[in-house]
Amino acid sequence: MGVITSESEYVSSLSAEKLYRGIVEDGNIIYPKALPRFIEKAETLEGDGGPGTIKKLTFVGDFGSTKQHIDMVDRENCAYTYSVYEGIALSDQPLEKIVFEFKLVPTPEEGCIVKSTTKYYTKGDDIELSKDYLEAGIERFEGFTKAVESFLLANPDYNKDSN
């Protein structure tokens, strides 16, 4: 098995705590609202949201679903890691799983820097993923995060107590 890594970061105007809560703790509620053209349903299949939890995202139309395993949750440091191990995200490439790691770093301006690392675990050591595929993955992750950010900005009272 090979591992191919890509990284990205961008600045959010939301506090790390508020964005973290929206993505990690309230994702099952927010994802379908923030991305209604893409996500039909987000649900926890087993677990309490901590490491070992299994989540499922069901996409709109005929795009199927993905299952995620929560690997690490660190609310204090606004860090989160999960693995996609089943579903549409793995169907078009020879991948065993995709691991998403992200950390939200507070900025002096009360926003945060969204840092993400994506690790693609291939079904062989000799497999390469195209630059376009890796860039599209970064764009999807950033688009997803920015959609949650936009939802929270448009609904400022949503998780006000964590701002």
Swiss-Prot record:
InterPro entries hit by this protein: Bet_v_I/MLP, Bet_v_I_allergen, Plant_def-hormone_signal, START-like_dom_sf
GO biological process: abscisic acid-activated signaling pathway; cytokinin-activated signaling pathway; defense response; nodulation
Chain positions recorded as kinetin binding sites: 68, 82
Residues the record lists as binding N(6)-dimethylallyladenine: 68, 82
Binding residues for trans-zeatin: 68, 82, 133
Pfam families per UniProt: Bet_v_1
Keywords for this protein: Cytokinin signaling pathway, Nodulation, Pathogenesis-related protein, Plant defense
GO molecular function, one term: protein phosphatase inhibitor activity
Keyword Glycoprotein part of the UniProt annotation: no
Source organism, top-level taxon: Eukaryota
Tissue expression as described in the entry: Expressed in nodules, but not in leaves, stems, flowers and roots. Specifically located in the nodule cortex.
Induction: Up-regulated during nodulation, but not by Nod factors or pathogen infection.
Subunit structure: Homodimer.
Family statement drawn from the similarity comment of this UniProt entry: Belongs to the BetVI family.
Annotated function: May be involved in nodule organogenesis rather in the processes related to nitrogen fixation or interactions with the bacteria. May regulate nodulation by controlling the levels of freely available cytokinins.
Protein name: Nodulin-13
Species assigned in the record: Medicago truncatula (Barrel medic)
Classification of source organism: Eukaryota, Viridiplantae, Streptophyta, Embryophyta, Tracheophyta
